[in-house]
Structures are given as C-alpha cells and as structure tokens.
Design a protein with these regions (language model features):
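Short aromatic-glycine-(Arg/Gly/Cys) micro-motifs in beta-strand/loop hairpins
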Residues: 25-51, 82
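Short, hydrophobic/aromatic-rich segments at coil-to-beta transitions
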Residues: 8-16
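Intrinsically disordered, low-complexity regions
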Residues: 1-7, 83
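Basic K/R-rich, polyanion-interacting modules in nucleoproteins and related proteins
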Residues: 1, 15-19
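Short, mixed-charge low-complexity intrinsically disordered segments
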Residues: 20, 24-29, 62, 71-84
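A short, exposed loop/beta-hairpin motif centered on an aromatic-Gly-Thr core
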Residues: 46-63
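Short, surface-exposed linear segments at secondary-structure transitions and domain or protein termini
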Residues: 35-39, 59-67
Length: 84
C-alpha cells in the first residue's frame, strides 16, 4: 500500500484563487518530484481546460506563477484567497 501523504506530488508550495464576475481561477505551484515543479492553472467553471506546466527549479515555477497572476490582475481578476 502506498502512503500518498508522503508523495512529492501532494506538496503544494502555494495556491492562489482569483475571481471575476461569477468565475474563479485557481493557480498553484506543486512539487511533481524532488527536482520538478508544476504550475497548475484551473478555470473552475471548466476544469477540462486546466493547464499544467513543468519546471526544473522552484524559481522558474515562481516566475511563471507571478506572470500568470500579473496577467490575471491586468485582465480584471481579483485575488480572493491564497495559501502558502
């Protein structure tokens, strides 16, 4: 039996949730492995359009997350909740 609580993929560095009108977008950084990070962007009204981008360093993932956050704010989205 695998203990998923110890899997690297279960580790979320941070998660931000944005909203605009009646829609929400979640953008998070999570560890994919010991040396791989993912930036996950999910429009919560259509999770089938989720995007996952992989990076070899947390610094690259943080930069991408910041760029996405900037783009969302510039498009009128508001930060509603965050963790991390």
């Amino acid at each position: 039996m695998t203990n998923h609580a110890n899997d690297a993929s279960d580790v979320s560095l941070l998660r931000w949730e944005f909203s605009r009108t009646h829609q929400q977008v979640m953008c998070a950084i999570r560890a994919a492995s010991a040396n791989s990070w993912e930036v996950v962007t999910i429009p919560l009204w259509d999770i089938g359009r989720a995007a996952i981008e992989s990076f070899s360093t947390v610094r690259e993932a943080l930069r991408r997350h910041a760029a996405i956050a900037t783009d969302l704010r510039d498009a009128g989205w508001t930060l509603r909740a965050y963790t991390g």
